[in-house]
UniProtKB/Swiss-Prot annotation:
It comes from Drosophila melanogaster. One of its GO terms (molecular function) is DNA polymerase binding. This is Fanconi anemia group D2 protein homolog. InterPro entries: ARM-type_fold, FANCD2. Belongs to the Fanconi anemia protein FANCD2 family. Disruption phenotype: RNAi-mediated knockdown is lethal at the pupal stage of the life cycle. Conditional RNAi-mediated knockdown specific to eyes, thorax, wings or nervous system gives no visible phenotype but increases local sensitivity to DNA cross-linking mutagens resulting in increased incidence of mutations and chromosomal aberrations. Homodimer; cannot be ubiquitinated and does not bind DNA. Part of a Fanci-Fancd2 heterodimeric complex that binds and scans dsDNA for DNA damage. Interacts with Fancl (via C-terminus). Its main location: nucleus. Residues 1429-1442 have a biased composition (Acidic residues). GO terms for cellular component: condensed chromosome; nucleus. Residues 33-53, 896-918, 1420-1478 are annotated as: Disordered. Required for maintenance of chromosomal stability. Together with Fancl, and probably Fanci, involved in DNA repair of damage caused by agents that induce interstrand cross-links but not agents that cause double strand breaks. Required for S phase checkpoint activation in response to ionizing radiation induced DNA damage. It is found in: Nucleus.
Amino acid sequence: MYKQFKKRSKKPLNTIDENATIKVPRLAETTTNISVESSSGGSEENIPASQEHTQRFLSQHSVILAATLGRTQSSSRNIATLSRQPNNFFELVLVRAGVQLDQGDSLILACDHVPIVSKLREIFTSASSYTDKMETFKTGLNAAMAPGSKLVQKLLTGCTVDAAGEEQIYQSQNSMFMNFLMIDFMRDACVEVLLNKIEEVAKSDRVIMGKAAIPLPLLPLMLTQLRYLTASHKVEIYSRIEVIFNRATESAKLDIIANAELILDASMHDEFVELLNINYSSTEDLFHMTTVQTLGNLSLSDRTQAKLRVRILDFATSGQCSDAILPHLIRLLLNVLKIDTDDSVRDLIGSLRGIFNWRHTNETEKISASEDSKKSQLELFGFLELGLIRSKKFYQACQRSSASVPAAEFTSFDMILLLLLIHVNEDNSLYIENILRRRIKLEHITVSILEEIRQHYRHILEQHITTLMNILHDFMREKNRIVSDFAKSSYSILFKIFNSIQKNILKKLLELTCDKSSPHLTTMALELLRELQRKSAKDVQNCATLLIPMLDRISDLSLTQTRVAMDLLCHVAFPDPNLSPCLQLQEQVDMVVKKQLINSIDNIKKQGIIGCVQLIDAMARIANNGVDRDEFIASVENVDSLPDGRGKMAANLIIRTEASIGNSTESLALFFEELATVFNQRNEGTSGCELDNQFIAWACDLVTFRFQASFVTENVPETLKGIKLEYQLNINELDDTDANTESDVLNIGINISKLVLSPKVKACDSIYVLAPLFNYVRVLYKHRHQDSLESINALLGCAIVLPSFFEDDNYVSVFENFEAEQQKDILSIYFHTVNWMRVSISAFASQRDPPTRRRVLSRLGELIRIEQRMKPLLARAPVDFVAPPYQFLTNVKLSNQNQKRPGPKPAAKLNATLPEPDLTGNQPSIADFTIKVGQCKTVKTKTDFEQMYGPRERYRPMEVEIIMLLVEQKFVLNHQLEEEQMGEFLGLLELRFLLEDVVQKLEAAVLRHHDSYDADSFRPHLAKPEDFICDLLPCLHEVNNHLITLGEAIDNQLTEVSHVYSNLDLFKDQFCYIKSCFGLCVRLFALYFAWSEWSDKSQEQLLHKSLLKLQPKTQWKRLEKQSVPQLANLTFQYFLKYEKSVLNLSTAVHLHRLLCNLLKLGSLQSDASQPRFQQAEDLRILCGTLLRRKWFHYSGTLDKGGQCNIYLDELVKGFLKKSNAKSQTELLTELVKQCSILNTKDKALTSFPNFKKANFPLLFRGLCEVLIHSLSGQVSVDSRGDKLKLWESAVDLLNGLLSIVQQVEQPRNFGLFLKHSLLFLKLLLQHGMSALESIVREDPERLTRFLHELQKVTRFLHQLCCHSKSIKNTAIISYIPSLRETIETLVFRVKALLAANNCHSAFHMGNMINRDLHGDSIITPRSSFAGEENSDDELPADDTSVDETVLGDDMGITAVSVSTRPSDGSRRSKSSSRSKCF
């Protein structure tokens, strides 16, 4: 391959970099190290600045080559003998210059490039006929550059340098053609030949390749030769390239585009892009991958980038843009950051948001390779991250955009963008967290956004998951329930999405459980851990050992927290049989519960009981192998008869726990309640395990015997403590059975009175164990007999041993003649009776055979009647009487603390001294009391339709099964059923009772509203709230039917009274029950659809069924295929029609909440057909209609008070939410005309009859806040039109508020007006000055009018501050420094603006005299502090809800970053004490 006269080893050639020299040893026996010599910089200093431009090319290129190749040496070696003679003058010149033409695939040079160029120049300059020689050379070059020539690829590719006298051979990157271009007199001819050949090749129908062992496409090689001529021949090159491009084939065009950055001067880039736009009218053709990559490297003007941005948007939103090319389009868009102006950055963000939002709402999801998808997604956001790093203005604009974008436009892209912002600059993490926190509070962001991120940005989320986890960890600690719920649901979703972070999530949750500062946080973390274990048992089981340290924290937990923690630990220690158990955790749990059981401290022993129950449940659940359930009936004599296994272990643990409990009645009752709760839980959705059949049979026989022995009696009642007892309330005769059975049934009774009056020593015989034990019995029987309780149905209607006088008409008189101790015993008897009836009714409510159902309804009627009859007795009860406990979880100290709550003074005193009932079971001494009955007035108790139970009526909650009565029972519109209707129908009393119970359970499950008297109360239905929601599904249709019936009754009555809402017929008992039941139905639906888990995708099917149930049954089949948003829309329109049937303010508010929840459910999915904006407007109109009605209490009096104000406040917020300037102006105009009437005592507004002067600040505050809220939202939107128009309308509205303040002088209104005026002025300083600048020269008179209107406000503020200082009103004085500073800044800015535009006449500033609100001069401040109290104290006592905390956060200001808190009193303004206003 090389010269053949010299021996050398044939080593492969080394391709070198232009900036380095790689030396290769010539002799094989010589060993030298390869060295890389860095090129020297500063070689250009030897080139004269005065050298001609045409000569500088040669000089610069020669210097580069010299630096690259090292010291230039002349070759003393003779040229090798060629294998052939030169064919033409062109080849002869090359040979003479030292070029070998036919050796391999490249030209071999006898020396480096600079001597070659020198020899070529010498050959031509020394020739006699210079011009002819040049033409001959050009002809030969033209022939050599022909596509079919063997030399063309050699001329265009790098040469091999074999310099004589040097032990090196290297491959140069410069071609021979580049040597020709270095000679000034040859350059133009060579360029001409090159461009002609480029055109020839580009027009060819096929891709022309070179003639070499490895042929290469010729067009890219030819184009590369032009890269050093872009400055000297830019016009010529572009003009020819333009012609060539227009005539080239598609593949040739792509080659030209790919090399455009190198061959075209930067000044020609805009013209080239215009050429592309002309040639590619289709955006799909224009944005080829090659084109996009080239466009990203070109230097383009603003105008060209704007045109490209439009086409990019069209292409990205056309559905033709692939995921692979999108990152490069985004990179092309980000090139605008080179300009980095406010307008360009704003347009860029708008374009980015438009592209991402369109792709996620309109584009059908494509299935692509996961690796390709991951690569393109990471590449895309990598470009965005680089843009955020490169441009501070872009970073800040993205931050502001995410903070101010409307709620409807906040998408998963914005969420990812915020995570990127934190990643780029962690210093801003607190500010960005606050953005997210505020949006979550306002419910702009729900957990559904994580589902969107999982679908669209899974890979980038995984990259930034640590950042998100840190944010969620902080959000879990939030006191705001919405924020903490968001974090909780987010953890659950992330746990299912990413396996890699499951351990981290568990560790963070375990960390939160150890936080002693917040019990609520601990409870929430424990509940979330239990939820994760239920939904992802296998994943949690893999991390079982992480949970062991939780056992060390058990002693610090409350009893309810212990229940959740032990539920988690026990079911991980003893998981489903198909999962591997954690033996280490089993040993630790067993050891801990044994220690707790033998502990003498009551609370720790209860923890041990709760732990044992959870352990029993986990052990007793075995795999369901499809065994016939009839085998359950078989009896098991004792524990030893049970087969070895987990069932026998559970039975032994029950015996051990009972032995540890000993004679503690409270602990035994708690044990039975806990067992009933855990055994009653359903695990169909999370586990395939059921309780062991033989274990159930053993436990069932055991507790049945105990119950019969302790509480069922057949003895004749006797007189105890002077109280005559007898069998009462026996309804078993209603059962149609044979004579023998009936006689047996009629002879038994529940011995409640005897156990109260003469308690037994054993804890198992205590009256307090009656209800818990029966609850446990019925759960076991349902498991054993396939939900049938037929074998124990006699207990439902059997007699109860009660005092004989209770059925008398004068029972109150008889009760009052007893001694105090006897009265306590009698009341205890009836409390236990009510609790027994509640637990028995709940047990049999799910039984469907007609005789049992009749007894259930009859017993329910008796229960309601007894509870009503107890009300007058409780009113006359001894002061120290305490109702018997219905739950046994709360400690004594905790109970006393909970009872010390604010309220009426007598009740507070009563509750503070209540002793705890005796649960020891010790028998008191029996004495014979004589009774003297005297005359007493009959007492008629008035029904409270607002609150069903008073503070002393603490009854056991009904079980969940009670809802079956709502599903399967007929309803009649009577509050007192006829005799033949009893046992067959539900009346208004029964319906109200059932709805009230279900609503209370829903509040506990959905809103976590627990009993204020028993904060740690036993709530069986709360074990799994989702189960309760599922249980309610069947009854939705029936409750809706009841709602229709009640609504029709209300409408008919309204028609009869001609819609006069004050008519006395609307306040009769019968109609009040109808109104109460109607309100409870609406409240039930509102709570049901307020469940936070509806946003979880796993609940979508349940939500769909729930919404379908509320449609007419005839349309169910047709509507089955409707989406959730469509069904929510139909349901919204359905409930909206009930506005006319609402007669109570509380019902009106619950209807508003229901519609808000349905509106939110309609927004869970993206559905373009969903008319959400119209629904929001309908909701606003509804609130306005409700506010303009006069509301009356059930008693017929005008509704008022603190609760009324809270309801009115909620309607005001709904009415003013998102109202525009026009509606605000109309409302203000209306109020300005009417507000003067408020100065008259007890007069209300004509348009809003529920607002008097006392609660008018509610409405006024709403007007102030909606003005600032709407203004702050509009100033952040890009407005290209008249910017001053917005501020003119805002000042008009502010002056309307000023007019109201001046007419209705109320301290509360003064403070509200000052606070929001200060916010307005700060907004004007931040965003309004540009609007003033735009109008100052065009229309000075308009600016004058604006300043004049603003002057009215500032003058009043000045007078208000002076007046407040004179009367020492500290609430307003605290705002004065901040207000003074803001006004002075505004004055300075306005004066500077006018001075710069020579418009001084539009502004005048003078020193104002200090005056009070009535215009009188204030000479000296008053020394008295009589008026120093806060203005809030002037409001009446029933108006405490007017405080600003009631309003919440949803009317908060989004764009005002400057703090509006009252300034510190010590802060001094820099100006003089004399105020200056304009």
